[in-house]
């Protein structure tokens, strides 16, 4: 047995030394493998297998999930959603109006927001004082810029896509013809992403806190001034697709070429700032300029007429027939219901217009203009006529000298016209206006106006008191001259 002398002792006291078995820390005989030469694994006595060190998360993951980019996406989402919700009455029920307002919101809100957000993100290295640290890493300046800029660009594009999806879902229950313009929304999303990258590049080149503000203001001013102009240069405005409701459709490649114009500028700026060979920036710049030339040269040809806007759907069971534009055929039952009182009173009357028409032209002879239903948000909201009595009154006005700029030549004809209109479409608002004028004329002692108003009341009472057959016959003679601006007094029947 081995013995060990304890220090400080006299050497006579012995302590047994631990045996080999006692030194064994792995009595079960289990061994762990460790890598050896030539890929061979050797056993390591005792202990657990060595854990591999956890790899650091990819920088893109951190940019995607934390920091400024998600908050910027949420901010743009709220801004665009608020803009659409505030004017929901003006686009729900019309694919064209929905597309137009989404494009306008993207141009006037999304583009300035993306430029400012990108600029703020691009200047963060200067604010954090980490520019020198980043320059010492193995990644190239181009990779560093893209890693920081692309997550923000994708978040902003995703915010726009979510707002578009919500708007289309809100429009679909009330729209009855046409469909969404998906290339417009795809082009606008790409343009917003390009604006974020362009703003990021400017923020890196001019890394000051106030750089974002001039970019946002400049984006808004350019979009508002140039985009609403009359020259063909307006087609260069980012995201602003120039259509007018349901009457025009953007050609399918227009939004994509517009996105190429923005993306080319962004790519040229990125390469000019970060590439080792700055001349490579000329390639995307040439693509951007080519897209710009194509947009300006094509001009109004970028928008074509909607074939549906030249057609009508009609209800031939009424007198006159009622036709609405084929871009919103679902409004026909609602319009027919709103005009049911008017058409019921005209049943059996001769010399009426054949139909109410709803095309973008002056009515032909034998037609009357249907009161306008567009733009959405005035006479019609979400597939309903907002004020049926007012709408019927407007439709009655279209039957009696609607295109005449001067009053009839004699007062008797004017009195007769007023009596007929009051009988065809009684309107509480018109009645209140008449009472106001009557009261004012009495207070001012205006005998001429009092006499005219009393004559109109008497004519209306005589027309109302007529038997139905006699009234239909009288109205037939009256409507024989109702479209003439200066009929002979002898041709207009009196009351």
Positions of the model-derived regions?
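Membrane-interface helix-boundary motifs at transmembrane edges
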Residues: 134-135, 139, 143, 203-208, ...
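Alpha-helical transmembrane segments of polytopic integral membrane proteins
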Residues: 112-119, 128, 163, 195, ...
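Small-residue-enriched transmembrane helix-hairpin modules in multi-pass membrane proteins
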Residues: 394-396
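Amide-forming acyltransferase catalytic core, primarily the GNAT-like/NAT-type
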Residues: 249-260, 272-290
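Solvent-exposed, acidic/flexible segments
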Residues: 195, 332-335
């Amino acid at each position: 047995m081995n013995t060990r002398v304890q220090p400080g002792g006299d050497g006579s006291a012995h302590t047994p030394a631990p045996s080999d078995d006692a030194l064994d820390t792995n009595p079960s005989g289990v061994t762990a493998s460790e890598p050896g030469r030539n890929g061979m694994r050797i056993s390591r006595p005792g202990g657990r297998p060595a854990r591999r060190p956890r790899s650091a998360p990819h920088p893109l993951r951190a940019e995607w999930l934390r920091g400024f980019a998600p908050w910027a996406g949420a901010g743009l989402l709220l801004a665009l959603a608020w803009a659409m919700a505030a004017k929901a009455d003006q686009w729900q029920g019309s694919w064209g109006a929905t597309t137009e307002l989404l494009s306008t919101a993207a141009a006037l809100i999304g583009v300035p927001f993306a430029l400012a957000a990108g600029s703020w993100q691009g200047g963060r290295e200067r604010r954090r004082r980490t520019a020198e640290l980043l320059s010492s890493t193995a990644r190239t300046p181009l990779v560093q810029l893209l890693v920081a800029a692309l997550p923000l660009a994708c978040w902003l594009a995703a915010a726009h896509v979510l707002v578009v999806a919500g708007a289309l879902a809100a429009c679909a229950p009330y729209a009855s013809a046409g469909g969404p313009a998906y290339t417009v929304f795809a082009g606008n999303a790409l343009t917003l992403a390009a604006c974020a990258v362009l703003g990021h590049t400017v923020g890196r080149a001019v890394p000051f806190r106030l750089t974002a503000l001039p970019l946002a203001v400049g984006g808004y001013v350019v979009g508002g001034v140039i985009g609403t102009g009359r020259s063909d240069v307006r087609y260069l405005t980012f995201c602003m697709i120039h259509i007018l409701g349901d009457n025009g459709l953007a050609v399918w490649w227009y939004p994509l070429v517009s996105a190429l114009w923005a993306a080319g500028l962004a790519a040229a700026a990125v390469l000019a700032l970060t590439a080792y060979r700055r001349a490579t920036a000329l390639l995307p710049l040439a693509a951007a300029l080519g897209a710009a030339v194509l947009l300006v040269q094509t001009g109004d040809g970028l928008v074509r007429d909607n074939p549906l806007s030249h057609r009508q759907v009609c209800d031939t069971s009424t007198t006159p027939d009622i036709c609405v534009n084929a871009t919103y055929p679902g409004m026909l039952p609602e319009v027919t219901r709103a005009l049911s009182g008017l058409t019921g009173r005209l049943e059996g009357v001769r010399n009426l217009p054949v139909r109410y028409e709803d095309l973008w032209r002056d009515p032909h002879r034998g037609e009357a203009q249907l009161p306008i239903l567009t733009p959405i948000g005035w006479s019609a909201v979400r597939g309903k006529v907002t004020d049926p009595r007012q709408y019927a009154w407007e439709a009655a006005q279209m039957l009696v000298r609607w295109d005449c700029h001067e009053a009839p030549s004699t007062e008797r004809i004017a009195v007769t016209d007023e009596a007929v209109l009051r009988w065809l479409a009684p309107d509480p608002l018109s009645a209140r206006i008449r009472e106001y004028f009557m009261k004012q004329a009495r207070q001012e002692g205006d005998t001429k106006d009092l006499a005219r108003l009393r004559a109109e009341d008497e004519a209306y009472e005589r027309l109302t008191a007529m038997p139905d057959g006699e009234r239909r016959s009288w109205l037939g003679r009256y409507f024989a001259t109702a479209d003439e601006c200066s009929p002979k007094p002898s041709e207009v029947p009196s009351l």
